[in-house]
């Protein structure tokens, strides 16, 4: 593969030029997209069957499906968010609005019947929140923009910990990872210079031997 070619070339004292047009015999151009000069992040689904392309500065995500026959990703198409239309709106597909969507992660949803169904969570940097996208393209706000705390000072941003939607607030969040073993999100709060956590814990009601609803809240982490 290309990885082996790269290693051999560097090991033998050579250089490596990653520009496709300069190396037509090494790289294969799969497709071009409308925003080559903007910031991109690519998130490949755990099954490898599709990927999301996040266009940070133009406020939307594209989706590229994997062609099993050709063994390559096809030209991506607009999936959620409006091309060059920043804003804040929970909605479906291209009707949703976001503002500088940054890092995201796929998280398996056990409520879905399919074994390959994952929700996609991402940080919406200039909307100061964590958003969620279902496989069908339904965009919702998962955490941040505290409905109650924002009433006190009129800001959707802040450093409050607590209930995900009523209390918790973030400021310019740019990073997000998920620990499957701990069932915990780690959120990079850029302006606050902190790593915040969101836990999804399900406590057991010993008396009734039943599960009570999930306790989801944010806390500051020193990890």
Language model features with spans:
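Short, small-residue-biased leader/transition segments that mark boundaries at the very start
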Residues: 1-6
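Short loop/turn segments immediately following beta-strands, especially the blade-tip
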Residues: 10-17, 64-71, 199-204
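Gly/Pro-rich loop segments of beta-rich domains
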Residues: 11-38, 72-102, 138-174
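Structural WD40 beta-propeller signal
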Residues: 45-47, 107, 179
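Conserved beta-propeller blade signature
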Residues: 50-53, 119-122, 184-187
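Short loop/turn segments immediately following the C-termini of beta-strands
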Residues: 56-57, 66, 125-126, 190
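Blade-level signature of beta-propeller repeat domains, shared across WD40, Kelch, NHL, RCC1
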Residues: 172-208
């Amino acid at each position: 593969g290309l990885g082996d070619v790269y290693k051999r070339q560097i090991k033998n004292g050579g250089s490596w030029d990653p520009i496709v047009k300069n190396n037509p015999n090494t790289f294969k151009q799969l497709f071009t997209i409308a925003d080559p000069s903007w910031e991109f992040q690519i998130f490949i689904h755990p099954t490898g069957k599709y990927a999301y392309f996040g266009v940070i500065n133009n406020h939307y995500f594209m989706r590229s499906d994997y062609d099993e026959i050709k063994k390559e990703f096809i030209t991506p198409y607009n999936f959620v968010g409006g091309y060059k239309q920043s804003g804040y709106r929970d909605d479906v597909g291209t009707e949703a609005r976001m503002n500088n969507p940054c890092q995201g992660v796929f998280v398996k949803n056990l409520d879905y019947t399919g074994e390959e169904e994952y929700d996609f969570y991402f940080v919406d940097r200039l909307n100061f929140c964590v958003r969620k996208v279902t496989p069908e393209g339904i965009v919702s706000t998962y955490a941040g923009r505290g409905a109650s705390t924002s009433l006190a000072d009129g800001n959707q941003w802040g450093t409050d910990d607590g209930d995900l939607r009523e209390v918790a607030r973030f400021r310019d969040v740019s990073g997000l990872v998920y620990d499957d073993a701990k069932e915990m999100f780690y959120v990079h709060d850029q302006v606050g210079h902190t790593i915040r956590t969101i836990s999804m814990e399900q406590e057991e009601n010993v008396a009734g031997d039943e599960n009570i609803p999930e306790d989801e809240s944010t806390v500051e982490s020193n990890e």
